[in-house]
UniProtKB/Swiss-Prot annotation:
This is Small ribosomal subunit protein uS2. Gene3D superfamilies: Glucose-6-phosphate isomerase like protein, domain 1, Helix hairpin bin. Belongs to the universal ribosomal protein uS2 family. One of its GO terms (biological process) is translation. Keywords: Ribonucleoprotein, Ribosomal protein.
Length: 246
């Protein structure tokens, strides 16, 4: 059984690309036709590429790999957060801070600051500080949480990125490529597929399309984790083999 059906893709509007004047010729192989000035994506190819992305993600997660979900455009923000949280992975859904990957040590210092302020809030320090200082700390905490909340538990560089709209997230793409971190991406007709390791040709502007495809990547991670749990349970319940001596 395939990971995703043509019906699901059609209903979510995955096949609608960009206007023909806003296209990248490298996406030609994923285009089925043109209709009313808009490119229509070949969903047969999308089905196959979703399957490829699903298996890649599942295998990576099965080996303990960590995946960073990235989508800062309005249509992607909610799905990216929800599906990353659901699958126990990390996310960036606001602004990508330059150096998130390539200057990871500096980002870790900002995350430490975020956690320090959280501790101050939890252990009662806020109650003994001047009101003005507390207001400033709360503002700082809110800002740090907004931009770093989705990666505050990410202790090492991720093993892969899942990106919605590589054109919009070009800084994230450039950083990942510099560090040889593989990228899975939802790639519309105006993007460059050569920058992405596992291309999912799809509409990256429709909320339903983004939600559907992002949820499939989360499903792949959860399937891998479930497989691990079942294997561990089987090991625990397996009867010990007795050895007999002649």
């Amino acid at each position: 059984m395939s990971v995703i059906s043509m019906k699901q893709l059609l209903e979510a509007g995955v096949h609608f690309g960009h206007q023909t004047r806003r296209w990248n010729p490298k996406m030609k192989r994923y285009i089925f036709t043109e209709r009313n000035g808009i490119y229509i994506i070949d969903l047969q190819k999308t089905v196959k590429k979703v399957e490829e992305a699903y298996n890649f993600t599942k295998n990576l997660a099965a080996e303990g790999g960590k995946i960073l979900f990235v989508g800062t455009k309005k249509q992607a923000q909610d799905s990216v957060k929800e599906e990353a949280v659901r699958s126990g992975m990390y996310y960036v859904n606001q602004r990508w801070l330059g150096g998130t990957l390539t200057n990871f040590e500096t980002i870790q210092k900002r995350i430490k600051r975020l956690k320090d302020i959280e501790k101050m809030q939890e252990n009662g320090t806020f109650e003994v500080l001047p009101k003005k200082e507390v207001v400033q700390l709360k503002k700082e905490l809110e800002r740090l949480e907004k931009f770093l909340g989705g990666i505050k538990d990410m202790k090492d560089l991720p093993d892969a990125l899942f990106i919605i709209d590589p054109r919009k997230e070009r800084i994230a793409v450039a950083e990942a490529r510099k560090l040889n971190i593989p990228i899975i991406g939802i790639v519309d007709t105006n993007c460059d597929p050569d920058e992405i390791d596992v291309v999912i040709p799809a509409n990256d502007d429709a909320i339903r399309a983004v939600k559907l495809l992002t949820s499939k990547m989360a499903d792949a991670i959860l399937e891998a984790k479930q497989g691990e749990e079942e294997a561990e349970a089987a090991e625990e319940t397996a009867p010990e083999t007795e050895t007999t001596t002649a």
